């Protein structure tokens, strides 16, 4: 009966250990942490170092995946920007072409044509940025996440972890055999103890070799992870910075060209209307108070002090007149109305 109880107790212990091992295998991270000293202090330090390296490489791998996901999202958004930008560019160019007959007078058609042509450069910058993300960020990080050096190093650490668990279990077995020899030092118990101790020595030797190999492999992978990920992160930041700078420069040029066209239209003299016999024009004399340089053939050069015969005044602030035998347009703000010429000598200059 006692032998049966001991056998049942031993069976329960074995089942409990197996259940614990299964739970650890499926609930753990791949490398099991433990504060139990299996062999000595040196092995304990290596175990803690491997645990730290395993967690560090796993964290770096997850961070690399996060960067890859972000870069993939940037690329997808960029493709949508290109699609929307291409459609807008086509719409702007079409509107400008449909209203090209009077494009100099239609500032909206002119602005649409300017933006439609320049928008192609914006889309080209987006394409270049997407290519940079693929070659400088996505491809290198994907290769490292799925690379064999990382997996090989982690497998070594996992093998060491399993071997350490085996050694921890076997150390308990050695202690049990030692206690049994003390209780009954018969040859059979002594032989079993010697076998258990020999196996323990073999486990210690194998752990020493495997521990060094796993530590070196994980340390090398950790260093490579940090170095490569830092380089790819810097490349992504630099590429995004340059992308936004070039986009800003293109948009600044577009804006400046639009504003210039608007200012030119607002400051340009009005078109000369077709006159008919029934139209009456009021003439008056004016003196130039500010010099004016003509910017086109329709405009008139003026020097301060000149006298001019004003023939037409438009609602845009421009006037048409004649001075020194030449006719053209000029800003009304540059002249003042006079009742008569100061001397007869000036009359010849006017006409």
Swiss-Prot record:
It holds the Pfam family SH3_9. Residues 281-340 form the SH3 domain. SUPFAM superfamilies: BAR/IMD domain-like, SH3-domain. Interacts with FREE1. Interacts (via SH3 domain) with DRP2A/ADL6. Binds to SH3P2. Keywords: Coiled coil, Cytoplasmic vesicle, SH3 domain. The gene is SH3P3. May be involved in the recruitment of DRP2A to the accessory protein complex and in the negative regulation of its GTPase activity. Transmembrane segments: none annotated. It comes from Arabidopsis thaliana. Residues 1-21, 193-213 form a coiled coil. Residues 31-267 form the BAR domain. PANTHER family: SH3 DOMAIN-CONTAINING, SH3 DOMAIN-CONTAINING PROTEIN 3. The keyword Coiled coil applies. PROSITE patterns: SH3. Its main location: cytoplasm. One of its GO terms (cellular component) is clathrin-coated vesicle. This is SH3 domain-containing protein 3. It is found in: Cytoplasmic vesicle, Clathrin-coated vesicle. Disulfide bonds: none annotated. The keyword Nucleotide-binding does not apply. Detected in all tissues except seedlings.
